[in-house]
Each structure stands twice: as C-alpha cells, then as structure tokens.
Amino acid sequence: MARVTVEDCIDKVDNRFDLVLLAAHRARMISSGSPLTIDRDNDKNPVVSLREIADQTISPEDLKEELVHSLQKFVEVDEPEPDTVPLIGSAGASVDADDTEVAMERMTEEELLKGLEGLAPPEEQPEEDE
C-alpha cells in the first residue's frame, strides 16, 4: 500500500483509523465480487479500495453505512405496538382459586426488631497475619 495513496485519501476521510476500516471493508467487498469502479492496474484489493476512495468513485459515507450494517448482529425493526394491551390481573383474566386464598402475614416494626434482637451475631474469626 503506497503512502501516496493514503495521503490522497486523508482529505476525504479525516481519521486514519476510519480510513483503514473503510478501505478494509471495501477490499473485502471487492474480494467477495463487488464490481470495481476504477481500473485495477495490477493493484491488490486494499490499494484499489484506497484509490476508489481517493478518486471519490465510492462515497465514504456509503461505505461507513455498509460497514455498520455488516457489523450489526440484530437489525432493529420499528414495528408499531398494538393499541390495546391487556392489563395483568384485568377482569377478563382467569384467576385460580388457590391464588385467592393466600394471605400475607403482617408484622409490626416492634415485632420485627424483637425478632432481630433474638438473632445471634456472627462469630468473629481471628485474622491471620502473613
């Protein structure tokens, strides 16, 4: 990869890291059969992709969009949500008889504190010096 080719591209893509990512993605596209927009001239795919970016036959913004799309694991599709969502425990829902008989035992703060006082504190373990 000639340094001149990179220097020609740096005014099209400001960040060298982004330039390398875009050129590598375009080189992979060329390897997978994407048509060339310039003559090859016995150059390898990375050099051809840099020359395409330098000659502005390929848009860096389009390449970036394709790169992001190729790296996505899940494609988000905005689907409209249904207007009416049934509420949990609504009148139309069936309720088992066993669920209605469950009663919660209530405890006052004083009873809770008395119960906590009855608990034994954890035993202290001697620290080992190394």
Swiss-Prot record:
Recorded catalytic activity of this chain's protein: RNA(n) + a ribonucleoside 5'-triphosphate = RNA(n+1) + diphosphate
GO biological process, one term: DNA-templated transcription
SUPFAM superfamilies membership: RPB6/omega subunit-like
InterPro entries assigned to the protein according to its UniProt record, in alphabetical order: DNA-dir_RNA_pol_omega (IPR003716), Pol_omega/Rpo6/RPB6 (IPR006110), RPB6/omega-like_sf (IPR036161)
Keyword Transcription appears in the UniProt entry: yes
EC top class named in words: transferase
Chain segments carrying region Disordered: 108-130
GO molecular function ontology, one term from the record: DNA-directed RNA polymerase activity
E.C. code: 2.7.7.6
Entry-linked SMART domains: RNA_pol_Rpb6
Cellular component GO terms held in the UniProt record: DNA-directed RNA polymerase complex
Keywords: DNA-directed RNA polymerase, Nucleotidyltransferase, Transcription, Transferase
Subunit organization: The RNAP catalytic core consists of 2 alpha, 1 beta, 1 beta' and 1 omega subunit. When a sigma factor is associated with the core the holoenzyme is formed, which can initiate transcription.
Annotated PANTHER family: DNA-DIRECTED RNA POLYMERASE SUBUNIT OMEGA (PTHR34476:SF1)
Family: Belongs to the RNA polymerase subunit omega family.
Record's function text: Promotes RNA polymerase assembly. Latches the N- and C-terminal regions of the beta' subunit thereby facilitating its interaction with the beta and alpha subunits.
Name used for this protein in its record: DNA-directed RNA polymerase subunit omega
Species this protein is from: Rhodopseudomonas palustris (strain TIE-1)
The encoding gene: rpoZ
